[in-house]
């Protein structure tokens, strides 16, 4: 477990608890289903499985390790432990089977059109400010 990551999450959970919040919405799983840490076949990180280039036949890439393997188990364990220590429940919308199935049912052309095209289109259509092609996290 990365101390820096756990410390950052603990800080956020402490502030959330002080504000009376009881639920933390996690972003875990978003990178894995929307981009696989890459785009157009170019791996942005070493643990990318297929460089974000979704094939016509998904059976050629399933199950990919960063989504179904130890990465998610580690992230979830950290978030559950840290948030739980502040009495905050964690929810994982990007790990919901219906969200994953909906995204995976889209055509490869749509999924491969732009880096994280589904999120880009949603944020753009709703005039939500964001930094394009910039990953900010802890």
Where are these regions (language model features)?
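Short secondary-structure boundary micro-motifs
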Residues: 7-8, 57-59, 65-69, 75-77
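N-terminal glutamine amidotransferase
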Residues: 9-13
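Mid-to-C-terminal catalytic subdomains of enzymes
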Residues: 21-26, 30-45, 69-138
